[in-house]
Amino acid sequence: MAVRARPRFEIRRMRADDLDEVMEIERAAFRHPWSAELFRRELEHDWSTILICIEPLTSAAGGRASERIAGFLIYWLVHDEVHILNVATDPQHRRRGIAKFLMSETERRALQAGATLMTLEVRRSNVAALELYRTFDYRAVGVRPNYYVDEGEDAIVMVKELRRFR
């Protein structure tokens, strides 16, 4: 059966059976990746959400054959604040708007849940991520020295205030 990719992507919550594919992306994206156990714990917490961006694959006959995970985003919702913990895109899907799609969906869900603030930390050296967050109107508000203890790198603390439109 021939399989071809559809040009659109979808977002859904991660399930336990997605873990192997998500771990492949995590290992490809980071020098010091999270462990599978950390992902399992995030799946168990009520306040934690792991969104995955999937690329549906169709058969030559036009039916849905399977899906491939293109990226993921992990966030916590605590009271009226969303904290983004981890964002990664599969190297084969980079520069295709996957992270932007995940960020937009996270913000939509944050607003729907009544959140008023979004926060995150990012490596000072991660220029691509800093640019992405700035396009979403995040602003730097501080530095956490040696936050990334693996290499002694500082984290830039960024925030975005959410405004509801009525």
Can you describe what each PLM-predicted range is?
Residues 20, 37, 130-131, 149:
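Alpha-helical elements of the RecA-like P-loop NTPase motor core of helicases
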Residues 100, 153-162:
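Accessory recognition modules or surfaces
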